[in-house]
Every structure is written in C-alpha cells, then in structure tokens.
C-alpha cells in the first residue's frame, strides 16, 4: 500500500495499477482497457473470482498518484469541487420545484440507474411533503427496464427530442447525462441540445474517461463526435454554465463491462452529490467534509459486502452449476432491491448472449413498485412479467432441482410473506439462497433460518441521522446488492467459459459502441490490423467469405442491424482469424467445443500461429 493518501479511508485500496502507466494500451480509453489485476480471470476458481472483482471495485476509491499519469480520481480536489458546484445548482431546483427539474438520463445500465435515482430522491422529497422534481430518461423507453434495447442509444436526435418533451414548460433544468465511456450518441444529442438552450438548461456529463479519450468518430447521420460535444461542454466549466464529472475509476474487471464498476461509480457519485444538495437545502452548507462523509459510507458498504466473500463464492458456484445444467437463476427482491435484481438479470443478455430466461429478476408489487412512467408493461409478453405473483403463477410450476432461486430482502420487509414464498419454492428445488440486510440489533427469525440452507447476512450500523441521512442506508444496501449480483453473474458466466482472459468474447453487437469493441477485441487477441479484423467481423456477421461491395459500403448502423439476429459473431471471427480458416469452419469448431473459451484457447495454441499483441504482453 502506498502511504501518501490525503484522506482517511475505511478500506484498503489496491496499489496503483499498470493501467495508470503511460503507454499501457494507449490507444484505448480507460473504460475499454483490460485490467491487469484480472488478466487470468478465466482461470480463477469462485473464491479467487470474488477476490479479484472485490479488488477491482475497491479501485473506485483510490486516490490519484502524483508519480503516475495524472488521472483525476473520485477523491481528487477538482472532482470534489465540481460535485459541490453541481450540488449547489441542484439546490436552486429544490427551492423552485414548480418551474424547475433535475433530469437524469442514460442508456442501458445508466438509464436504469437514472430511474432508480430519480425515484429515490422523489421519494425523499415526498417524505418531507415537498414537490418531487426529479425525472428520468432511458434510451429505448420503459421497455429498457426489463429488456435490452441497446440499439436506441445510437440516436442523438431521439435523445434531444425526449429531453425537450419531458422539460416542456420548465424554466430551469439541470440535466445529468450519464455515459460511462463518454460515447453514447443518445446522450451527446441531449448535451448538444442543452448547450443550444443555456438560458434554460445546465448540462452535466457523468462518465469515467478523460475528455481526450471520449469517442472521436463522427456519429452517423449527425454533425459531431461525442468528443467534440464534450470539448464544447468543457469550455463552459469556468463560467459554471456546464460541468463534467469524469473521475477515473480504472478498467472493468471484465474488460468493457461498464454495468459493473461504471454503474457502481455512477450510483456512488450521483447519490453523494444529490444527498449533499438535500442536506444543504436544510441550511447545511455544501462542503468537502459533507461529501467525504457520504463517500466513506460507500467504502463501508464495500467492506460489509465483501466480508461475506466465502458465501458470495458459494452462490456464484451454485449459479454456474445451474446455468451449466441448462437451469436458471431466479432473483426475487423486495422494494428497490428487486429493481437491482432485475437490472442485473437484464444486463446478462447483451453481455453474455444469454437467453432472457437464464437469469430473471422479479420485484414485489411489480411495476407499481418500480414507479415507471409508462406503467404496467406485462401485457407486452412473458419477458415483461416481473412481479412475484407472475413468478408464482407462470414460472414456479416449471422450476426444478437444476434451478437456483435467490431471495433478497431486509428484515423490515414482510417476513411472513417471505416465509410462505420459501415454502412454495422448497417444493420445487432445494437450491434456495438468500441475501438478507439487517440493521444492528435485528435478527432473522429461527423459523426462516431453519428453512434456508444458505444465507448471505449483511448487518448495517444504526445511523442516528436526520431524515435525508436515513436514505444512506437504503443506498448502501442497494449498492451492496449490486456488487454481489455483478460478482455472482459475471463469475458464473466466466466459469461457463464466456470470458477469455478478462475479455467478453460473446457479447451481442447491437450498437456502434459494441461494434467498435468487437474490432478492438479482435485486434488485441489476434494481433491483426484493424482493417483485417473489421473484414473478418463482417464475414462473421453476414456468413459470407467474400464480401460484396454492397456489404463493404454499408454503414456501421447497417452492420449492427445485421448482427442483431446472429449469435456467436465475435467468437467465430476470433477463431477464424487465429486459425486462418473459413467462417463456416470456425463456427463448426466452436459448436463442437466444450465452451467458447476452450475453442479460443485451443486456437491460440495452433502450431506456427503468429503471436498477437495480447500473447506477447502476457509473456
């Protein structure tokens, strides 16, 4: 551990990583780099997987090291100052809620977090008999809560239209656009719209790359790149007409999987500054001390969560076993913990090309508990059925011993209802697991303890704080649950062979960001040129060895549309490049392999194969 830290911390953070050194994967933004800590993630057992992902999460709280590249971190003075400046502007909205609005917007995980945060802070205001003034926007609309709608994030015009619609009639709008990699066109369109109407809008960008690493390709069908938009926003900082909050939190444990660390850092950063704004509205000044106090509660959440590492590893192993046997993981949560479970389940589909039935989330009260704008969506089909009643009626009858059922609740929830549900599930499977949140002095009844073989018990200290402060414990429990689920599902799919080293190698290519990521992974694993990797990726998408001029001249949006209906696009391209074989031969090899990882591993070891960039680095 380095001994030059400015602030007192609750947890031990890792030493500075190789990723901070000049020249490390320098062509890639931090959010897309591979984390040196998890380089052999695919060879780890469940206990090691938990430890590695725990250490990656701890990087969120690292302070900057003056001896390395000067990345601003969460605890950097400049970041804390900007958080305070934004909190003061939130205060202005809170004082005039009738004419004002705080809008949180994002795509995918970021959009789901926007919903969670908007509802949390509206709930805080309602509890104080004040007017709610938070609103969320998700690319793809409310369908994106429970299904992956990633292609909609490529439309900047739609982003601007959605923003204009929700802000109609408002005179003062604080807009917070979340894009972990500083790349989402949907958010770029909204920021651009704000900067063209600065008399009403104050734009704030949240992400985890320096502006110099923002996506620089011009957005198809639009006038700018994301970087150009971010650079314009940067020029507004000194006049406080716009802000960028972009601390570096390090590469993801699973390369590029921003649902993990990026999502957690988003939650920590925004809840901290918004809570400080609410405290300050009660005549407490916005100070660095206030920000640091709240940030430390999230460090404490990390410590409490990973004190249960052994049990988290057991849950991961059980989940991997269920998935390996073509079973399922069903996550049943109470309150906002149910929404956190739904979020994790939905994100497995694009990240690991999972079937939507593999991991499913359910929430007590269904859409009524989620409080989404469009109301009950269950009529859209079984994928949209998310209440506990839906689970009992439509899913439980087919549950078997190969399935795992995970219940997530607090000891303030209806324990009689929970006990009845446990009894129903036990008739179908013995694989019942529980994540139970308690406050110090609360204990799980013996009747429940006896019926549940495996319990991850998390006990939180009593907080003697004012009303706003009581929300800290709710936020801690949500983050803790998120960390556990991220670790369990990412680890389970790693054990299933969906990860090679620490790279996602079987994700759905359903937007421009993922198309670029696929070509980047191909380059890093094979050492081939960008042009050659793009060519083979297109061969895999279209299933044609010889590409027509029409295909070559198609836009990235066209390629993404074609890729959406295909499976194993990236692994087929990887094996084809490594073996110099046809797309058809590559697909056949993958289909006959034990796992995608094993197909790539054996292709890496083909005699006479030219070593790629990642091979030489790993020696």
UniProtKB/Swiss-Prot annotation:
SUPFAM superfamilies per record: SIS domain
Binding site for beta-D-fructose 1-phosphate: 109-110, 153, 179-181, 347, 513
Principal localisation: nucleus
Domain SIS: 90-283, 319-498
Gene Ontology terms: biological process: carbohydrate derivative metabolic process; intracellular glucose homeostasis; negative regulation of glucokinase activity; protein localization to nucleus; response to fructose
Family, as annotated: Belongs to the GCKR family.
Comment on protein domains: Fructose 1-phosphate and fructose 6-phosphate compete for the same binding site.
Protein name, as recorded: Glucokinase regulatory protein
Taxonomic source organism: Xenopus laevis (African clawed frog)
């Amino acid at each position: 551990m380095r001994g030059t830290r400015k602030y007192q911390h609750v947890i031990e953070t890792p030493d500075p990583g190789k990723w901070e050194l000049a020249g490390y994967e320098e062509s890639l933004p931090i959010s897309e780099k591979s984390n040196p800590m998890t380089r052999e993630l695919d060879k780890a057992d469940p206990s090691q997987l938990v430890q590695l992902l725990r250490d990656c999460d701890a990087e969120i709280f690292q302070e900057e090291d003056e001896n390395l590249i000067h990345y601003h971190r969460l605890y950097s003075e400049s970041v804390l100052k900007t958080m305070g400046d934004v909190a003061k502007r939130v205060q202005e909205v809170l004082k005039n809620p009738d004419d004002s609005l705080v809008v949180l917007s994002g795509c995918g995980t970021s959009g789901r977090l926007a919903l969670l945060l908007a509802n949390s802070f509206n709930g805080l205001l309602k509890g104080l008999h004040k007017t709610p003034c938070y609103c969320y926007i998700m690319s793809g609309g409310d369908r994106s809560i429970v299904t992956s709608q990633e292609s909609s994030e490529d439309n900047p015009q739609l982003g601007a239209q959605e923003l204009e619609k929700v802000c109609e009639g408002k005179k003062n709008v604080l807009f917070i656009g979340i894009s972990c990699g500083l790349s989402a066109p949907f958010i770029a369109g909204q920021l651009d719209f704000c900067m063209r109407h600065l008399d009403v809008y104050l734009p704030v960008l949240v992400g985890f790359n320096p502006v110099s690493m923002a996506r620089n390709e011009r957005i198809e069908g639009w006038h700018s790149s994301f970087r150009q938009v971010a650079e314009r926003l940067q020029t507004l900082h000194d006049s406080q007409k716009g802000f960028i909050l972009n601390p570096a939190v390090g590469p993801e444990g699973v390369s590029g999987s921003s649902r993990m660390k990026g999502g957690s850092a988003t939650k920590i950063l925004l809840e901290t500054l918004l809570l400080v704004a609410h405290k300050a509205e009660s005549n407490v000044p916005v100070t660095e001390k206030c920000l640091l106090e709240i940030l430390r509660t999230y460090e404490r959440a990390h410590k409490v969560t990973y004190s249960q590492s052994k049990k988290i590893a057991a849950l991961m192993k059980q989940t991997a076993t269920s998935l390996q046997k073509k079973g399922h993981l069903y996550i049943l949560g109470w309150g906002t913990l149910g929404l956190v479970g739904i979020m994790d389940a939905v994100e497995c589909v694009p990240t690991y090309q999972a079937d939507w039935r593999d991991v499913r989330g359910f929430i007590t009260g269904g859409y009524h508990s989620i409080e989404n704008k469009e109301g009950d969506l269950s009529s859209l089909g079984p994928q949209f059925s998310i209440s506990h009643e839906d689970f009992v009626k439509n899913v439980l009858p087919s549950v078997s011993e190969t399935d795992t059922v995970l219940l997530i609740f607090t000891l303030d929830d209806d324990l009689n209802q929970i006990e009845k549900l446990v009894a129903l599930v036990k008739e179908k499977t013995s694989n019942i697991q529980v994540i139970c949140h308690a406050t110090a002095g609360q204990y799980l009844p013996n009747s429940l303890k006896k019926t549940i073989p495996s319990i991850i018990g998390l006990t939180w200290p009593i907080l003697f704080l004012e009303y706003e402060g009581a929300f800290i414990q709710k936020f801690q429990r949500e983050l803790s649950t998120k960390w556990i689920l991220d670790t369990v599902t990412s680890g389970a799919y790693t054990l299933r062979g969906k990860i090679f080293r620490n790279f996602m190698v079987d994700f759905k290519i359903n937007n421009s960001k993922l198309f670029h990521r696929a070509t980047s992974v191909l380059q890093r694993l094979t050492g081939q040129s960008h042009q050659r990797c793009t060519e083979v990726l297109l061969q895999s998408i279209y299933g044609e060895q010889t590409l027509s001029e029409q295909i070559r001249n198609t836009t990235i949006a066209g390629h993404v549309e074609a890729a959406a209906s295909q499976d194993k696009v990236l692994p087929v391209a990887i094996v084809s490049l490594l073996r110099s074989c046809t797309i058809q031969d590559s697909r056949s090899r993958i289909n006959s392999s034990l796992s995608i990882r094993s197909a790539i591993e054996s292709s890496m070891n083909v005699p006479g194969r030219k070593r790629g960039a990642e091979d030489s680095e790993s020696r």
